């Protein structure tokens, strides 16, 4: 029997599986489109309504959504896009693929999100956009200040909300902060469509461009094969959309489970004698964390490899977030001649962060077992 101590586990309740099988059969036996049909539109509408945006464009990945977002705002050769370095490769590769230059920005060690102070230092006349990443499902407490700063400087703000479905700040949901936002529905994410992504915005012109670009540049307002711009094939399938519709029905339960697990982890770690050696992210009252990952910062004296080895003995998965930092990935080192020391806070953070398992199949007993094993593993290094 599968143990529940996995870093991520796509979960579909039994009643949703029954519903999905019925709907899949209807598609396969009917005359409906297999791609970009009514279910995609339904998923887009429901998702946009959940987040609070006007428009949604379903794609086949978050990477595609990021590329389309940059193309929609007219990013081109010579432009600069500021990005945090504690993030997945796609945040940077999307910028390069659209011909712009990524400007690597350090993070706030307390949140693992982009530092507003460092961001301001990076702005030049060439800055076209800023991408903020809601790291591990945490919206930066400075997110609204970053939005105001970008508006003041006439810079487009893009949210990489791949981790953060259901997160919010001051009641504003992730995906409804920037000019454009992008979500991931990869199997490891809180909500999955196997492969898939979503672009959200509330500007009609941006929406029309994005809607066209994900469909090879086709003019979606006219009949026939009319192409008014150069796009790519990044369409979402009806099957992916059905998975998304099903998952959205369960999302509140998924989030409740994750927050319960995180609360247990927080309570037990803070009450233990290792609290000075393992510091979970502190979440301000105005923020609802989605907990795609549960991040801990370890004291430099603690060897995270040894902790991982100890947890492995109890079949408990563990991990750390995005190592090495984005700017130190071999591709970017070679292309831009970057060396260690450019973003010292992130470089230190990525040497010391640690993730305990958190997924929607876990229960309180699972969480208690995991955190007790973690505390014991850290105590073993005292």
Where are these predicted regions, by residue range?
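Helix C-cap/helix->beta junction micro-motif
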Residues: 98, 152-153, 314
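Active-site phosphate-binding strand-loop segment of PLP-dependent enzymes
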Residues: 110-193, 198-200, 204-205
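Phosphate-binding glycine-rich loop
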Residues: 32-80, 94-97, 104-106, 172
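Conserved PLP-anchoring active-site segment centered on the Schiff-base-forming lysine
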Residues: 67-122, 129-131
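Hydrophobic/aromatic ligand-binding patch that stacks against planar heteroaromatic rings
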Residues: 93-95, 149, 173, 239
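N-terminal "arm"/small-domain region of PLP-dependent enzymes with the aminotransferase-like
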Residues: 1-33, 357
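PLP-dependent aminotransferase class I/II
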Residues: 38-45, 50-56, 117, 129-133, ...
